[in-house]
Amino acid sequence: MASTKPGQRKLQILQALASMLEQPKGEKITTAALAARLSVSEAALYRHFASKAQMYEGLIEFIESSVFGVINQITEKEDGGMEQAYAMLNMLLGFAANNPGMTRVLIGDVLVNEDERLQHRMNAFYDKIELAFKGALRLAVTQGHGQEADVAARASLLVNYVTGRWHRYAKSGFKINPLEATSLQLSLLLAA
C-alpha cells in the first residue's frame, strides 16, 4: 500500500473489509485480521480511519449512495407506480446478490458489537427505503392500483420482505440467492 494515494488506500481498506464480510461463516472481523489481509500494520489502518466504526460507516455510505442513486433513476425512468415498486424490489434484492459482504451490513449482522450509531444509521436507511416504496405506491393509487389507506402497510410489508430475503441469503452462507423465485412472490405482494 506504500505506493498508493491516500484516497486509494481508504478504498483498498474498504474493499478488503467488504471481501472479508463475504466469508460465509460470518466471524467477527478484527482490525488485526484486516491489517494482515492488506499486509500492513494496524497503525496504517488507523491513519485512514479513526476506528473500525468509521470503516463500517464507509461501507454504509457506499450502500446508501448506490441504492438511493438507483432509486432516483427508477423514479425518473418509470412512469408507473407499480413498475417503480417492482423495480425497487428487484434492485434491492439484486444489490445483495451482487454484494454479499454488504448484505451482512444491511442486516446489521456485523454491527452488533460496534458503535450503536451504526445500527441507528441502518434503521434510518430502512426508513428511507420504506418512504421510497410509499411514494411509488401512492403514485400507483393515482393510477388505479390499490387504496391510499393501504399504502403505509404495504410499504412496510415490502421492506420486511426485502430484509427477510437479505437475512435468509446471509444466514444461508450466501447460498440462497435473494432473487430466487421472487417473480411470483413480488406479483402477490404488489397485487392490488
Task: Describe the predicted segments one by one.
Residues 21-24, 30-31, 42, 52, ...:
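Amphipathic alpha-helical segments enriched in hydrophobic/aromatic and basic residues
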Residues 58, 72-98, 151-158:
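Hydrophobic alpha-helical connector segments
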Residues 9, 52, 59, 63-67, ...:
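Hydrophobic/aromatic residues within well-ordered alpha-helical segments
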Residues 39-49:
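Short hydrophobic/aromatic patch on the recognition helix
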Residues 65-68, 72, 116-142, 152-156:
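Amphipathic alpha-helical packing segments from all-alpha helical-bundle domains
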Residues 1-37, 54, 66:
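Basic, helix-initiating cap at the start of DNA-binding domains
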Residues 103, 107, 119, 123, ...:
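Hydrophobic/aromatic-rich alpha-helical bundle segments in the mid-to-C-terminal region
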Residues 96-117:
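Amphipathic alpha-helical segments used for helix-helix packing
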